[in-house]
Amino acid sequence: MARLINQDTAKRLGLPGRASIEPISGEIGSRCSVRIATIAVPPPGAKETTRGPHLHDGFEEVIYVLSGAGTTHAESGKIPIKPGDLVLIPAGEKHMTQNTSDVPLVLLCFFPVPDVSAGTTEFASF
């Protein structure tokens, strides 16, 4: 049966330094092997703490930029991002994304697994 999942009913992820929701995952009964998260990274100077670098062991991440502008920092280099851009982060590559604009940087993140928590490692710095 088709169903509507909106931002008001989506699971809140509680990631540091960003508003984050998970509208599609195995937890809501989705049988697809994809997890989708919407992330809003506040502008520089916001009171929230930023999320540091992290990596996903055994699976990649695809980031689609909906609005704002920023930089994805990865072990392979810095990638400036803007609306319409897609960034592919290979499995095991340490990365983080920073907002470089004066509006929230809104990202749609795709993972080819229903749960990323077991394969994600957080780091204090690069």
Regions found by a protein language model. Name each.
Residues 76-91:
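Short acidic-glycine-tyrosine-enriched beta hairpin
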Residues 72-73, 89, 95-101:
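Short beta-strand His + acidic residue motifs that chelate non-heme Fe in jelly-roll/DSBH
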Residues 58, 77, 93-94, 103:
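A generic "binding-loop/recognition-motif" signal
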Residues 3-6, 30, 44, 96-126:
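Double-stranded beta-helix
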Residues 2-16:
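Catalytic-core "active-site belt" of small-molecule-metabolizing enzymes
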Residues 12-53:
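A short glycine-rich, His/Asp/Glu-containing loop-to-beta-strand
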Residues 38-41, 55-72, 110-112:
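Short, conserved beta-strand element in jelly-roll/cupin
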Residues 32-34, 69, 106:
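Intrinsic-disorder/low-complexity, polar/charged segments enriched in Ser/Thr/Lys/Arg/Asp/Glu/Gln
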